Amino acid sequence: MAPGGPFMRIIIGGGGRVGSGLAKALRSEDKEVVLVDNNARVVKNAQGMDILVIYGDVTKRNKFIEAGIDSAEVYVASTDSDELNLLSCALAKHVHAEKTDGKGNLTTICRLRNPHFVEEHKSGKLGQWAGVDHVVHPIDDAIDRLMSGLRSSSLSEVIPFEADAYIVELDVRSEASNVVHRTLRESGAKVEGGLPLIVGLKRDGNQGKVPTADDILLPNDRVAVATAGEASFNRILRILGHEAVDFPEKPKVIIFGASLIGTRLAKAWQRTGASVTVVERDLQLANNMAGSDIGDLPGIEIIHGDHLDKELLSEIEISSMDIAISALDNDHGSIAAVLLAMDMGVERTGLILYDADLVSVVRRMGITFSVDRRRVAIDAMLSRIHSELPGPYAVLSSVPDVVGICLPVTDRVKFVGKTIADAGLPEWCKVAFIQRKNIHDEWETLRPSSSKNLLEGDKLTIFLPPYRVYDLERKFKV
């Protein structure tokens, strides 16, 4: 079983955007949450969340005792400081062991930015000297979301779910004549090839929900759609009333900034066959990238220069680029860089942002797609907290009252060999994907149908209200 059930105690060190967002998500699952922070404003803001809030320093032993570390099952270090997070994880482990006479078990989850510490974790050494069980370093996940989201200007969110499975979030437009003012069942009969699988529905003024076949779609509804393969995005867009534009097979990509994120972005795009140009105004950073293994990769050009220099951008023919992405350390600087690229003719633009509030703002500016790295971090933390589960955990941004979890079909459940229709799954949840290993021992994503049999070893991605997560975990005996 996932640790502790609905009333497990989780202590969060750091109540900034990540810590408070995590606390809110966990309370929606009825978890017992304690938040510790030494910022009076943060503590005051958190007091309306129905959690225990403690003003204090997470490097102080007495604050962990006050937070009830002896009865806690998870400690999450979510401050903006790597060093503080590492130190607090080590202290939390020590105090917990001391208070339980070494008989308890505390899982520690540490948010980190420095890739050196991430490598320490991969080698297994970080757990030995810092007491860290899981590390959250969501840059690669953020890059995956950004690369998928840039395929269309109409998608508000893209969440990868392993084995080429995706959740895409978008609005329903009035032009979607086959689906608006119809039930999902009626729309399925009207749409050639069937209606895409909608797993979340949000209407202004109403709570988000997992829709049933009798729910009606209206213009401006926000929906979350389960699909397999990025090639399916355009079909979803057309059915829901959006214009679909083909994505270039080998795009030309310009990246502003040779930071850690810029470096990872360049590698990721190069692996897809794209040609990549990186512009970096800091000579040392530009030289560092050029002298690294990235500088030797085919299809990557690194230029030392100012990303706001119109003359330079004209010289490198920025108008011929398919995509412009800014990877600067400052959100406002990144926004300025891609807006200039838009003015100079680049149609698709992307950002990885620190400030969640800017995500909707930049969309109104016409920027194609942006990713809130803090939200990606929260999803990663939730996955680690539900560490008994075999796959990702995601909160839908457009439909915040619905979450997606991945659950295993084992020999312990009663519905092995049965169809989805006969499995007796509750009506408040919906299966988005079946993932199954093929003859090559590789995971494949299958579209669920009521007649498809569930086999031992399958993984089901299921969407449901967050307060029902524990109920479903019990049904799957995890």
Each PLM stretch: what is its role?
Residues M1-V478:
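Cytosolic regulatory regions of ion transport systems
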